[in-house]
């Protein structure tokens, strides 16, 4: 019997080499994919937080405007007028909350949400702003901002909740911002 020297790889050696090569490529790609997904989630969370903060600032603006428009007495802003214009946001009037469009000219009274759901915000891609203008398209994230105010004689708790469904169709944990505002003294 004569033996021949065989050169090359066996089938098993080739399969193991291909498997190792595939794993060395798949690992970094998986990490990069997770990083990209996390970046998109963080971006949406930032937008949600700033939309909530924008609503808080709008409530403050409307409170300040109502106090400045009504002459006060020695105790400051009149107790009956300090939340004037925000009636649809009071939980005693509209338990579902309201929507505030901070970009509307001559801001109308906030609109009460109906059926337990507020209107979806729209995005103006030209000016890079969110609003409730029906002429603007819906965003892929579909942000929904709900404003609720619980008030007493001299204090109000403003709660803003921003919900959204991301580009992949996953409902994310809502952003909730609470702030106490007070009647001017």
Segments predicted by a language model, with ranges:
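Low-complexity, Gly/Pro-rich coil/beta segments used as flexible assembly/activation regions
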Residues: 46, 50-185
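N-terminal hydrophobic targeting signals that begin at the initiator methionine
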Residues: 1-2
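Aliphatic-rich helix starts adjacent to a transmembrane/signal segment
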Residues: 5, 9-53
């Amino acid at each position: 019997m004569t033996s021949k020297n065989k050169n090359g790889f066996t089938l098993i050696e080739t399969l193991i080499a291909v498997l190792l090569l595939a794993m060395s490529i798949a690992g970094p790609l998986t990490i990069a994919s997770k990083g990209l997904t996390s970046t998109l989630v963080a971006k949406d969370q930032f937008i949600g937080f700033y939309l909530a903060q924008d609503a808080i600032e709008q409530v403050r603006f409307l409170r300040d405007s109502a106090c400045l428009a009504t002459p006060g007495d020695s105790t400051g802003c009149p107790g009956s007028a300090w939340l004037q214009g925000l009636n649809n946001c009071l939980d005693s009037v509209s338990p579902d909350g309201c929507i505030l469009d901070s970009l509307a000219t001559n801001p109308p009274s906030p609109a009460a949400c109906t059926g337990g759901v507020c209107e979806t915000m729209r995005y103006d891609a030209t000016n890079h702003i969110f609003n409730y203008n029906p002429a603007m398209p819906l965003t892929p994230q579909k942000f929904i901002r709900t404003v609720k105010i619980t008030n007493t004689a001299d204090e109000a708790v403003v709660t803003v909740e921003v919900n959204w469904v991301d580009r992949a169709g996953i409902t994310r944990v809502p952003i909730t911002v609470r702030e106490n505002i007070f009647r001017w003294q």
